[in-house]
Amino acid sequence: LTNKTARFLVNGTSIPEVDFDVGE
């Protein structure tokens, strides 16, 4: 997990789609 992905995970785990978007 990168800094951006981790940030999204902490900010809201209810939006995995955004997490994947940033990860890609």
Swiss-Prot record:
Keywords: Carboxypeptidase, Glycoprotein, Hydrolase, Protease, Secreted. Optimum pH is 4. Unstable above pH 8. Its main location: secreted. This is Carboxypeptidase 1. Its EC number is 3.4.16.-. Contains both N- and O-linked sugar chains. The N-linked oligosaccharides are unique structures of Man(10)GlcNAc(2) and Man(11)GlcNAc(2). Deglycosylation does neither affect catalytic activity, pH, thermal stability, or resistance to proteolysis of the enzyme. Removes acidic, neutral and basic amino acids as well as proline from the C-terminal position. Digests preferentially peptides containing a hydrophobic residue in P1' position, as well as arginine, lysine or phenylalanine in P1 position of ester substrate. Catalyzes also peptide synthesis. Belongs to the peptidase S10 family. It comes from the Eukaryota. Glycans are attached at N3, N11. GO terms for biological process: proteolysis. One of its GO terms (cellular component) is extracellular region. Monomer. The lineage of its organism: Eukaryota, Fungi, Dikarya, Ascomycota, Pezizomycotina. The keyword Secreted applies. Inhibited by DFP. GO terms for molecular function: carboxypeptidase activity. It is found in: Secreted. It comes from Aspergillus niger.
